[in-house]
Amino acid sequence: KKGNGNYAYLDDIMEAEKVLVQELTQTFYAVADDVVMNLEFNPLLVKQYRLIGFDNRRDAVTDPSSYIEGGEIGSGSSTLAIFEIITSMPQASDSQNIALIKLRYSLCNNPNVEYLNFPVINNFEPFNRLHNELKLATSIAMFGMQLRNSKYLGTTTWQMIYDIALQSANTSNFLQNEYLSLISKADELYNGPKKRPGKRKKKN
């Protein structure tokens, strides 16, 4: 199907290790085909929502009659969807489900369609108490939105994005260190090199 499969650009030894060693099973071994995930929010708890990072398929998301073709999933792969929501009430019980995840897929070489449902509990946590993985994912989402000059970022700055990434990144992880470098390069490209304080020359 259109869009299935994987590709990679190997420009250094670290990228080759990532693709050919760390992610080998994800790249070469598919465990499911035509995978689609739908998320249904509980209208009693969620007043408005916005899916972040799906701008190229915005029409398909807003049109309930449209069909989004699923894709294949490799062994050990994972995916993360980030939503911005406005709640319908100030506080909700932790026992209430805020949404329902509906997963549709087919096993490889099997035409039968399988369905799985997963309730999403209301387990809100302040940002400073989130796991570092989620903080880093937030920084990456903000980074992409900043590149597109998104109106939803408000007063977010490159420095704020960098600070979140620096506090949550694993410094022994090459890819996460490379991400920190990308933020600095993007900041310089968008805003120009930062001026360093120096001594002023005395006028004669």
Regions found by a protein language model. Give the residues of each.
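Acidic, polar loop-rich interaction surfaces within structured domains
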Residues: 1-108
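Conserved functional hotspot residues or short segments at active or partner-binding sites
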Residues: 86-196, 202-203
